[in-house]
Amino acid sequence: MSGIDPKRFGKVAVLFGGESAEREVSLTSGRLVLQGLRDAGIDAHPFDPAERPLSALKDEGFVRAFNALHGGYGENGQIQGALDFYGIRYTGSGVLGSALGLDKFRTKLVWQQTGVPTPPFETVMRGDDYAARATDIVAKLGLPLFVKPASEGSSVAVLKVKTADALPAALSEAATHDKIVIVEKSIEGGGEYTACIAGDLDLPLIKIVPAGEFYDYHAKYVANDTQYLIPCGLPAEQETELKRIARRAFDVLGCTDWGRADFMLDAAGNAYFLEVNTAPGMTDHSLPPKAARSIGISYSELVVKVLALTLND
């Protein structure tokens, strides 16, 4: 194990559930995190903010929290701000990094200004003339395209659009989830990868090969036919450089401690970063446990390592 006395952590709340579209994933993540911490002898307890007021954390003597909430207020800076107010240390990024990390639009603006490569994109606002915007966007970006709400995670409501005729309906659907919709040029030819970060540890890259069109919600959490390639098959020098860029993509957003950065490669091997995740899934389908396991780090050891980062705050 980590060599840290479990008593140093004090009473720990595992935050999971919540009220976002990712509630069910969070419940699964949280239960596994809870068991992993308990397996290491840590005094960990379940806590669902959808069912109990956050003030109970302070009232009941919790001193730190493992945030296994996904999406919504669990990942957009709100829970982080509340925990700061109550003086409870927590895993993952603070208010700024969490808020930026969940907002794909502002993430891309920061990356454009700091030299992190990201696919060309356009934004559409809820209520725009979707047919007119679709014509303009196809002329600028071509096809195929990805349409996604700016602030949903786990690929919720993400659609791949292959024809101009299908774009207006995709825009309308995405706009029911967020007032800002991102329309992104699809990067083809080199595959999808993720870089998992845990403190000073850059875990091995994972190449994701979904059975369907792309790595959507079903492929992430339901299907058993998605392939996860570790090692990812890239030359060592290229993998090292991609890890460096992933770390920069994470850092320039103000993200800290642990998370994930997802990117595509084109046919020439150029990387284009899609998003970061500041509270990654921790289910049996999730990527950080897979990456850790590939280098001999067990699930329990990983969650203890993540929680141990709160000792350094």
Curated annotation (Swiss-Prot):
<protein>
    <recommendedName>
        <fullName>D-alanine--D-alanine ligase</fullName>
        <ecNumber>6.3.2.4</ecNumber>
    </recommendedName>
</protein>
<feature type="binding site">
    <location>
        <position position="262"/>
    </location>
    <ligand>
        <name>Mg(2+) 1</name>
    </ligand>
</feature>
<keyword id="KW-0479">Metal-binding</keyword>
<dbReference type="GO" id="GO:0005829">
    <property type="term" value="C:cytosol"/>
</dbReference>
<dbReference type="InterPro" id="IPR013815">
    <property type="entry name" value="ATP_grasp_subdomain_1"/>
</dbReference>
<keyword id="KW-0547">Nucleotide-binding</keyword>
<feature type="binding site">
    <location>
        <begin position="138"/>
        <end position="193"/>
    </location>
    <ligand>
        <name>ATP</name>
    </ligand>
</feature>
<comment type="function">
    <text>Cell wall formation.</text>
</comment>
<comment type="similarity">
    <text>Belongs to the D-alanine--D-alanine ligase family.</text>
</comment>
<dbReference type="GO" id="GO:0009252">
    <property type="term" value="P:peptidoglycan biosynthetic process"/>
</dbReference>
<dbReference type="GO" id="GO:0008716">
    <property type="term" value="F:D-alanine-D-alanine ligase activity"/>
</dbReference>
<keyword id="KW-0464">Manganese</keyword>
<dbReference type="InterPro" id="IPR011127">
    <property type="entry name" value="Dala_Dala_lig_N"/>
</dbReference>
<feature type="binding site">
    <location>
        <position position="275"/>
    </location>
    <ligand>
        <name>Mg(2+) 2</name>
    </ligand>
</feature>
<dbReference type="InterPro" id="IPR016185">
    <property type="entry name" value="PreATP-grasp_dom_sf"/>
</dbReference>
<dbReference type="InterPro" id="IPR011095">
    <property type="entry name" value="Dala_Dala_lig_C"/>
</dbReference>
<dbReference type="GO" id="GO:0071555">
    <property type="term" value="P:cell wall organization"/>
</dbReference>
<keyword id="KW-0961">Cell wall biogenesis/degradation</keyword>
<feature type="binding site">
    <location>
        <position position="275"/>
    </location>
    <ligand>
        <name>Mg(2+) 1</name>
    </ligand>
</feature>
<keyword id="KW-0436">Ligase</keyword>
<feature type="domain" description="ATP-grasp">
    <location>
        <begin position="108"/>
        <end position="308"/>
    </location>
</feature>
<dbReference type="GO" id="GO:0046872">
    <property type="term" value="F:metal ion binding"/>
</dbReference>
<dbReference type="InterPro" id="IPR005905">
    <property type="entry name" value="D_ala_D_ala"/>
</dbReference>
<dbReference type="Pfam" id="PF07478">
    <property type="entry name" value="Dala_Dala_lig_C"/>
</dbReference>
<dbReference type="GO" id="GO:0005524">
    <property type="term" value="F:ATP binding"/>
</dbReference>
<keyword id="KW-0460">Magnesium</keyword>
<dbReference type="InterPro" id="IPR000291">
    <property type="entry name" value="D-Ala_lig_Van_CS"/>
</dbReference>
<keyword id="KW-0067">ATP-binding</keyword>
<dbReference type="InterPro" id="IPR011761">
    <property type="entry name" value="ATP-grasp"/>
</dbReference>
<dbReference type="GO" id="GO:0008360">
    <property type="term" value="P:regulation of cell shape"/>
</dbReference>
<dbReference type="Pfam" id="PF01820">
    <property type="entry name" value="Dala_Dala_lig_N"/>
</dbReference>
<keyword id="KW-0963">Cytoplasm</keyword>
<feature type="binding site">
    <location>
        <position position="277"/>
    </location>
    <ligand>
        <name>Mg(2+) 2</name>
    </ligand>
</feature>
<comment type="pathway">
    <text>Cell wall biogenesis; peptidoglycan biosynthesis.</text>
</comment>
<keyword id="KW-0573">Peptidoglycan synthesis</keyword>
<keyword id="KW-0133">Cell shape</keyword>
